[in-house]
A protein has these predicted regions:
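Hinge/lid segment of periplasmic solute-binding proteins
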Residues: 1-43, 69-71, 176-178
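Paired acidic/hydrophobic, glycine-rich loop segments that form the ligand-binding mouth/hinge
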Residues: 155-160, 176
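Long, aromatic- and glycine/proline-rich binding clefts that accommodate carbohydrate-like moieties
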Residues: 227-288, 316-332
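Glycine-centered hinge/linker elements that transmit conformational signals in sensory
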Residues: 72-77, 113-141, 180
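Extracytoplasmic/periplasmic solute-binding protein
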Residues: 30-44, 68-114, 120, 154-155
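Short helix-initiation/N-cap motifs at beta->coil->alpha
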Residues: 65-69, 138-150
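Extracytoplasmic/periplasmic substrate-recognition and gating elements
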Residues: 129-136, 169-232, 266, 284
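Extracytoplasmic "Venus flytrap"/periplasmic binding protein-like
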Residues: 1-22, 54-57, 155-156, 166, ...
């Protein structure tokens, strides 16, 4: 459904309480009007064993951590314990491509597509190569980071909340959750946002608006969280009977998404059945640069050509964090 076919949603439809402004802006769909209202969210987070906290670099706040601080922290842990304990889901079924698309690239380039082979992108990959020195080598087998966290193989990890939850539910006193790191361009993160819009052809506009207002009530958002593990986009107080993972993730998600340097990156869109090939470009870049040790500049030049071919074939316009485009999203 295009934005031209949806009515403008106005403020009386949602409660007068803090609302995620970054998501509201995304819901304008490139227009000056609220066409789509974010409703619930899931995302990816960082998790750490509390044993790792003693090795944090001086002055580091987990809620505002940067990639440089994460690298220094991981180095400290490796040197003090004698083994690398950062963990990354780089296995065949891991969600590594989402990290590069939605976290690393936006944090260093402010882009996912257009600046794929930029100087800033080269910096991003070189920073990740630094981090990889202190990453558990078994990471190339990991899919769900909750497992190596529980076993103690890994002390600090990145993954989707659904793939971290078991660790927090089984050993709630052992772990902390915190936002993804920030880079020079902001705190890139990839939300999975469910939302609502009202088409102009709705047969009963009043009932449609009433449904939107109901779905955005705090109590409705809490009920949805219990049923689906998708988190509210409103600032709501969670009840005491929630699972340990929800209690840990809720504040971390709220902090990350409302951060002043937040840079949300949407899931790739408009690619049709080429989505898998799009993801493969980021996976191939990781395998060639980080695992294979190939030249960063050369790899990005070659992979950018593959990325451009996919975008041109699908004619997909840009999505956040890239600026809207009239035609296929450019790859500079």
């Amino acid at each position: 459904m295009t934005q031209a076919r949806c009515i403008r949603l106005r403020s009386p439809l949602w409660p007068k309480r803090p609302f995620n402004e970054a998501y509201k802006k995304l819901g304008m769909l490139g227009t000056g009007e609220q066409k789509y209202m974010p409703w619930m969210q899931a995302t990816y987070l960082m998790a750490a064993n509390k044993q790792a906290l003693q090795y944090l670099p001086a002055g580091t706040d987990l809620n505002t951590i940067t990639y440089d601080q994460l690298i220094e922290w991981s180095k400290n842990i490796a040197e003090k314990t004698g083994s690398p304990k950062f963990g990354f889901p780089a296995g065949p079924k891991g969600l590594k491509h989402r990290f590069f698309e939605g976290f690393l690239y936006p944090s260093y380039t402010g882009s996912m597509v257009t600046k794929f082979r930029s100087a800033e992108a080269e910096t991003a990959w070189n920073k990740f190569k630094e981090l990889w020195q202190y990453t558990n080598p078994n990471s190339t087998n990991y899919a769900f980071m909750q497992e190596p966290l529980l076993s103690g193989e890994v002390w600090v990890a990145f993954d989707h909340v659904a793939r971290l939850a078991d660790a927090f539910n089984k050993k709630p006193d052992d772990f902390v959750a915190f936002p993804a790191p920030a880079g020079p361009a902001g705190r890139g993160f990839m939300p999975v946002v469910a939302g609502v819009a009202i088409p102009k052809t709705s047969p009963d506009m009043d009932k449609a608006k009433a449904l939107v207002a109901y779905m955005l009530k705090p109590e409705t958002q809490i009920a949805t969280l219990k049923a689906t593990n998708f988190f509210p986009v409103l600032d709501v107080k969670l009840p005491d009977d929630m699972p340990a993972s929800v209690k840990a993730f809720g504040p971390a998600i709220a902090t990350m998404t409302a951060a002043p340097d937040a840079r949300p990156a949407l899931l790739p869109m408009g690619l049709g059945d080429l989505g898998g090939k799009f993801n493969q470009v980021y996976t191939d870049s990781f395998e060639r640069i980080v695992l294979g040790g190939e030249d960063v500049h050369g790899v990005l030049g070659e992979e950018a050509a593959a990325l451009k071919a996919i975008i041109d074939q699908s004619k997909a316009p840009c999505w956040a964090p890239d600026k809207p485009s009239a035609g296929a999203c450019p790859v500079d």
